[in-house]
Amino acid sequence: MAIVSVKLTSNQVDKFLILWRPYLVHNNHNYAKYTFKIDGTLIIIYNTNTCTINTHDINSFLNTFLKREDLTLFNVIKQQVNTKKNNQNVMSQSEIYESAQVIIGSDEVGVGDLFGGIVVCAVSLKKSDFKKINHLKIIDSKKLNDQQMQEIYQQIKNQISYTIVSYNPKEYNELIKEYNNAHILKTILHYKALQSEIHKHAKYSIFSVVDAFSSLKNWNQYLQKVNFQPYEPNLLIPKAESIYTSVALASIIARVMFLKMIAIIEEQFNVKIPLGSSNPLVNDVASNIFQKFGLKILKQVAKEHFSNFQQIIKNK
Protein backbone atom coordinates (compact mmCIF):
# COMPACT_ATOMS: atom_id res chain seq x y z
CA MET A 1 0.00 0.00 0.00
CA ALA A 2 1.12 3.56 -0.71
CA ILE A 3 -0.35 6.89 0.29
CA VAL A 4 -0.69 9.66 -2.27
CA SER A 5 -1.69 13.16 -1.19
CA VAL A 6 -3.40 15.67 -3.48
CA LYS A 7 -4.83 19.15 -2.90
CA LEU A 8 -8.45 19.78 -3.88
CA THR A 9 -10.59 22.86 -4.29
CA SER A 10 -13.94 23.08 -2.48
CA ASN A 11 -15.75 22.41 -5.76
CA GLN A 12 -13.65 19.30 -6.36
CA VAL A 13 -14.43 18.07 -2.84
CA ASP A 14 -18.14 18.51 -3.61
CA LYS A 15 -17.69 16.45 -6.78
CA PHE A 16 -16.01 13.69 -4.80
CA LEU A 17 -18.95 13.61 -2.42
CA ILE A 18 -21.47 13.39 -5.27
CA LEU A 19 -19.54 10.61 -6.99
CA TRP A 20 -18.66 8.50 -3.99
CA ARG A 21 -21.38 9.12 -1.43
CA PRO A 22 -22.32 5.38 -1.45
CA TYR A 23 -18.78 4.62 -0.24
CA LEU A 24 -18.81 7.00 2.75
CA VAL A 25 -17.63 5.39 6.00
CA HIS A 26 -17.40 6.61 9.57
CA ASN A 27 -14.05 8.02 10.72
CA ASN A 28 -13.15 9.27 14.20
CA HIS A 29 -10.30 11.40 12.87
CA ASN A 30 -10.74 14.92 14.26
CA TYR A 31 -9.57 16.60 11.07
CA ALA A 32 -11.31 14.38 8.51
CA LYS A 33 -14.18 15.89 6.55
CA TYR A 34 -15.08 12.78 4.54
CA THR A 35 -13.79 9.22 4.45
CA PHE A 36 -14.51 6.78 1.62
CA LYS A 37 -13.62 3.11 1.28
CA ILE A 38 -13.73 1.79 -2.26
CA ASP A 39 -12.65 -1.75 -3.09
CA GLY A 40 -9.80 -1.79 -0.55
CA THR A 41 -8.74 1.81 -1.19
CA LEU A 42 -9.10 4.34 1.64
CA ILE A 43 -9.68 8.00 0.72
CA ILE A 44 -9.68 10.69 3.39
CA ILE A 45 -10.54 14.32 2.66
CA TYR A 46 -9.45 16.62 5.48
CA ASN A 47 -10.82 19.98 6.58
CA THR A 48 -7.94 21.63 4.69
CA ASN A 49 -9.19 19.93 1.46
CA THR A 50 -6.07 17.79 1.38
CA CYS A 51 -7.03 14.35 0.07
CA THR A 52 -5.03 11.21 0.87
CA ILE A 53 -5.51 8.08 -1.21
CA ASN A 54 -4.21 4.87 0.36
CA THR A 55 -4.16 2.22 -2.34
CA HIS A 56 -2.15 -0.63 -3.84
CA ASP A 57 -2.09 0.90 -7.33
CA ILE A 58 -3.01 4.57 -7.71
CA ASN A 59 -3.19 4.45 -11.52
CA SER A 60 -5.47 1.43 -11.54
CA PHE A 61 -7.72 3.04 -8.94
CA LEU A 62 -8.01 6.34 -10.81
CA ASN A 63 -8.65 4.63 -14.14
CA THR A 64 -11.29 2.32 -12.68
CA PHE A 65 -13.17 4.60 -10.30
CA LEU A 66 -12.68 8.17 -11.51
CA LYS A 67 -11.77 8.46 -15.18
CA ARG A 68 -15.12 7.24 -16.46
CA GLU A 69 -17.06 9.30 -13.89
CA ASP A 70 -15.42 12.72 -14.15
CA LEU A 71 -12.64 13.17 -16.68
CA THR A 72 -11.85 16.73 -15.56
CA LEU A 73 -11.38 15.70 -11.94
CA PHE A 74 -9.41 12.65 -13.08
CA ASN A 75 -6.98 14.85 -15.05
CA VAL A 76 -6.49 17.25 -12.13
CA ILE A 77 -5.62 14.45 -9.71
CA LYS A 78 -3.60 12.50 -12.29
CA GLN A 79 -1.41 15.55 -12.90
CA GLN A 80 -0.68 15.91 -9.17
CA VAL A 81 0.02 12.19 -8.85
CA ASN A 82 2.47 12.27 -11.76
CA THR A 83 4.24 15.27 -10.24
CA LYS A 84 4.62 13.40 -6.96
CA LYS A 85 5.91 10.31 -8.76
CA ASN A 86 8.73 12.43 -10.12
CA ASN A 87 9.46 13.39 -6.52
CA GLN A 88 9.49 9.83 -5.09
CA ASN A 89 5.69 9.72 -4.74
CA VAL A 90 5.71 10.42 -1.01
CA MET A 91 3.89 12.87 1.21
CA SER A 92 6.05 15.68 2.49
CA GLN A 93 6.18 16.53 6.18
CA SER A 94 4.30 19.77 5.55
CA GLU A 95 1.51 17.87 3.78
CA ILE A 96 1.22 15.42 6.66
CA TYR A 97 1.07 18.20 9.23
CA GLU A 98 -1.93 19.65 7.39
CA SER A 99 -3.97 16.67 8.61
CA ALA A 100 -2.01 15.29 11.58
CA GLN A 101 -0.65 16.88 14.74
CA VAL A 102 2.10 14.33 15.40
CA ILE A 103 4.36 12.35 13.08
CA ILE A 104 5.76 9.21 14.71
CA GLY A 105 8.70 7.63 12.91
CA SER A 106 10.58 4.43 13.75
CA ASP A 107 13.81 2.81 12.62
CA GLU A 108 16.01 -0.08 13.68
CA VAL A 109 19.76 -0.61 14.10
CA GLY A 110 21.91 -3.70 14.50
CA VAL A 111 20.30 -6.10 12.06
CA GLY A 112 23.45 -6.45 9.96
CA ASP A 113 25.92 -6.66 12.84
CA LEU A 114 27.21 -9.98 14.13
CA PHE A 115 27.79 -8.56 17.59
CA GLY A 116 25.04 -7.02 19.69
CA GLY A 117 21.29 -7.41 19.41
CA ILE A 118 18.88 -5.06 17.65
CA VAL A 119 17.48 -1.71 18.77
CA VAL A 120 14.34 0.07 17.56
CA CYS A 121 13.45 3.65 18.37
CA ALA A 122 10.21 5.53 17.68
CA VAL A 123 10.22 9.34 17.80
CA SER A 124 7.18 11.62 17.97
CA LEU A 125 7.37 15.16 16.61
CA LYS A 126 4.77 17.91 16.71
CA LYS A 127 5.31 20.96 14.52
CA SER A 128 6.24 22.94 17.63
CA ASP A 129 9.09 20.51 18.34
CA PHE A 130 11.01 21.74 15.31
CA LYS A 131 11.83 24.97 17.15
CA LYS A 132 13.90 22.85 19.54
CA ILE A 133 15.78 20.84 16.91
CA ASN A 134 16.04 22.93 13.72
CA HIS A 135 19.47 24.27 14.71
CA LEU A 136 20.83 20.70 14.74
CA LYS A 137 20.29 20.17 11.01
CA ILE A 138 19.07 16.60 11.42
CA ILE A 139 19.95 14.42 8.42
CA ASP A 140 20.07 10.74 7.52
CA SER A 141 22.15 8.99 10.21
CA LYS A 142 24.12 7.16 7.52
CA LYS A 143 25.69 10.54 6.69
CA LEU A 144 26.75 11.15 10.30
CA ASN A 145 29.64 9.66 12.21
CA ASP A 146 29.20 8.16 15.67
CA GLN A 147 30.49 11.26 17.43
CA GLN A 148 28.04 13.52 15.58
CA MET A 149 25.15 11.22 16.50
CA GLN A 150 26.21 11.18 20.15
CA GLU A 151 26.29 14.98 20.19
CA ILE A 152 22.83 15.24 18.61
CA TYR A 153 21.43 12.72 21.08
CA GLN A 154 22.78 14.63 24.07
CA GLN A 155 21.06 17.78 22.82
CA ILE A 156 17.66 16.26 22.06
CA LYS A 157 17.27 13.47 24.62
CA ASN A 158 15.26 15.68 27.00
CA GLN A 159 13.60 17.78 24.29
CA ILE A 160 11.47 15.28 22.35
CA SER A 161 9.32 12.22 22.98
CA TYR A 162 10.77 8.83 22.06
CA THR A 163 10.65 5.14 22.97
CA ILE A 164 13.52 2.66 22.79
CA VAL A 165 12.98 -1.10 22.69
CA SER A 166 15.60 -3.76 22.05
CA TYR A 167 16.68 -7.38 22.17
CA ASN A 168 20.09 -8.21 23.55
CA PRO A 169 21.93 -11.01 21.70
CA LYS A 170 20.69 -13.73 24.06
CA GLU A 171 17.05 -12.65 23.63
CA TYR A 172 17.55 -12.27 19.89
CA ASN A 173 18.97 -15.80 19.53
CA GLU A 174 16.14 -17.34 21.55
CA LEU A 175 13.49 -15.60 19.42
CA ILE A 176 15.20 -16.43 16.13
CA LYS A 177 15.00 -20.10 17.09
CA GLU A 178 11.30 -19.68 17.82
CA TYR A 179 10.30 -17.68 14.72
CA ASN A 180 13.18 -18.34 12.29
CA ASN A 181 12.69 -14.90 10.75
CA ALA A 182 14.53 -11.71 11.74
CA HIS A 183 11.76 -9.62 10.13
CA ILE A 184 9.31 -10.90 12.74
CA LEU A 185 11.62 -9.73 15.52
CA LYS A 186 11.93 -6.29 13.90
CA THR A 187 8.16 -6.06 13.50
CA ILE A 188 7.63 -6.86 17.19
CA LEU A 189 10.01 -4.10 18.27
CA HIS A 190 8.65 -1.51 15.82
CA TYR A 191 5.11 -2.35 16.95
CA LYS A 192 5.98 -1.97 20.64
CA ALA A 193 7.83 1.31 20.09
CA LEU A 194 5.04 2.77 17.95
CA GLN A 195 2.31 1.70 20.36
CA SER A 196 4.19 3.31 23.25
CA GLU A 197 4.37 6.64 21.42
CA ILE A 198 0.77 6.39 20.21
CA HIS A 199 -0.34 5.85 23.80
CA LYS A 200 1.63 8.90 24.95
CA HIS A 201 -0.08 11.05 22.29
CA ALA A 202 -3.57 9.56 22.45
CA LYS A 203 -5.27 12.96 22.39
CA TYR A 204 -3.54 13.98 19.14
CA SER A 205 -4.12 13.01 15.52
CA ILE A 206 -1.18 10.81 14.54
CA PHE A 207 0.58 9.83 11.33
CA SER A 208 3.05 6.95 11.68
CA VAL A 209 6.00 6.17 9.40
CA VAL A 210 8.20 3.07 9.50
CA ASP A 211 11.47 2.72 7.63
CA ALA A 212 10.41 -0.22 5.48
CA PHE A 213 12.00 -3.65 5.89
CA SER A 214 8.98 -5.57 4.55
CA SER A 215 5.74 -5.07 2.69
CA LEU A 216 2.59 -4.05 4.54
CA LYS A 217 1.14 -7.47 3.75
CA ASN A 218 4.05 -9.19 5.47
CA TRP A 219 3.93 -6.72 8.37
CA ASN A 220 0.33 -7.78 9.04
CA GLN A 221 1.22 -11.46 8.73
CA TYR A 222 4.08 -11.07 11.22
CA LEU A 223 1.78 -9.41 13.77
CA GLN A 224 -0.75 -12.18 13.29
CA LYS A 225 1.94 -14.82 13.83
CA VAL A 226 2.87 -13.37 17.24
CA ASN A 227 -0.80 -12.78 18.17
CA PHE A 228 -0.53 -8.98 18.36
CA GLN A 229 -3.52 -6.72 17.79
CA PRO A 230 -3.57 -5.51 14.17
CA TYR A 231 -1.98 -2.14 13.52
CA GLU A 232 -0.89 -0.66 10.21
CA PRO A 233 1.49 2.30 10.09
CA ASN A 234 0.28 5.02 7.76
CA LEU A 235 3.42 4.67 5.70
CA LEU A 236 6.00 1.92 5.22
CA ILE A 237 8.66 3.37 2.97
CA PRO A 238 12.33 2.61 2.20
CA LYS A 239 14.89 5.24 3.19
CA ALA A 240 12.30 7.04 5.33
CA GLU A 241 15.11 8.49 7.44
CA SER A 242 16.13 10.65 4.48
CA ILE A 243 12.59 12.07 4.14
CA TYR A 244 11.06 12.38 7.61
CA THR A 245 12.79 14.04 10.56
CA SER A 246 11.13 11.77 13.12
CA VAL A 247 12.57 8.70 11.40
CA ALA A 248 16.00 10.34 11.05
CA LEU A 249 16.02 11.06 14.78
CA ALA A 250 14.80 7.54 15.54
CA SER A 251 17.70 6.16 13.51
CA ILE A 252 20.19 8.37 15.37
CA ILE A 253 18.88 7.45 18.82
CA ALA A 254 18.71 3.74 17.97
CA ARG A 255 22.31 3.89 16.75
CA VAL A 256 23.48 5.56 19.96
CA MET A 257 21.70 2.92 22.06
CA PHE A 258 23.18 0.12 19.94
CA LEU A 259 26.67 1.54 20.44
CA LYS A 260 26.04 1.48 24.20
CA MET A 261 25.16 -2.20 23.86
CA ILE A 262 28.44 -2.80 22.01
CA ALA A 263 30.38 -0.82 24.63
CA ILE A 264 29.15 -3.20 27.33
CA ILE A 265 30.53 -6.16 25.37
CA GLU A 266 33.82 -4.34 24.85
CA GLU A 267 34.15 -3.67 28.55
CA GLN A 268 33.24 -7.25 29.41
CA PHE A 269 35.96 -8.74 27.22
CA ASN A 270 38.42 -5.84 27.10
CA VAL A 271 38.42 -5.89 23.30
CA LYS A 272 37.40 -3.50 20.53
CA ILE A 273 34.27 -4.89 18.87
CA PRO A 274 34.16 -4.28 15.10
CA LEU A 275 30.76 -3.54 13.62
CA GLY A 276 29.15 -5.21 10.64
CA SER A 277 29.56 -8.86 9.74
CA SER A 278 31.75 -9.07 6.63
CA ASN A 279 34.79 -7.31 8.13
CA PRO A 280 37.55 -9.96 8.70
CA LEU A 281 38.16 -8.41 12.12
CA VAL A 282 34.64 -9.45 13.12
CA ASN A 283 35.51 -13.11 12.59
CA ASP A 284 38.83 -12.73 14.41
CA VAL A 285 37.23 -11.22 17.51
CA ALA A 286 34.37 -13.73 17.50
CA SER A 287 36.84 -16.62 17.14
CA ASN A 288 38.93 -15.34 20.04
CA ILE A 289 35.87 -15.03 22.31
CA PHE A 290 34.77 -18.52 21.30
CA GLN A 291 38.20 -20.04 21.97
CA LYS A 292 38.67 -18.29 25.33
CA PHE A 293 35.14 -18.44 26.75
CA GLY A 294 33.25 -21.07 24.80
CA LEU A 295 30.02 -21.27 22.80
CA LYS A 296 27.69 -20.32 25.65
CA ILE A 297 29.36 -16.92 26.06
CA LEU A 298 29.61 -16.28 22.32
CA LYS A 299 25.84 -16.80 22.06
CA GLN A 300 25.37 -14.06 24.66
CA VAL A 301 27.20 -11.43 22.59
CA ALA A 302 26.65 -12.40 18.93
CA LYS A 303 23.84 -13.44 16.57
CA GLU A 304 23.87 -17.20 16.31
CA HIS A 305 22.14 -17.57 12.94
CA PHE A 306 24.75 -15.52 11.03
CA SER A 307 26.76 -17.67 8.62
CA ASN A 308 30.14 -16.56 10.00
CA PHE A 309 29.01 -17.49 13.53
CA GLN A 310 28.19 -20.98 12.28
CA GLN A 311 31.50 -21.19 10.42
CA ILE A 312 33.46 -20.20 13.54
CA ILE A 313 31.95 -22.92 15.73
CA LYS A 314 32.25 -25.43 12.88
CA ASN A 315 36.00 -24.82 12.62
CA LYS A 316 36.70 -25.29 16.34
From Swiss-Prot:
Manganese or magnesium. Binds 1 divalent metal ion per monomer in the absence of substrate. May bind a second metal ion after substrate binding. GO terms for cellular component: cytoplasm; ribonuclease H2 complex. A divalent metal cation binds at D107, E108, D211. Keywords: Cytoplasm, Endonuclease, Hydrolase, Magnesium, Metal-binding, Nuclease. CDD domains: RNase_HII_bacteria_HIII_like. It is found in: Cytoplasm. It catalyses: Endonucleolytic cleavage to 5'-phosphomonoester. It is an enzyme of class 3 (hydrolase). Its cofactor is Mn(2+); Mg(2+). Its EC number is 3.1.26.4. The keyword Cell membrane does not apply. Belongs to the RNase HII family. RnhC subfamily. HAMAP family: RNase_HIII. This is Ribonuclease HIII. It comes from Ureaplasma parvum serovar 3 (strain ATCC 700970).
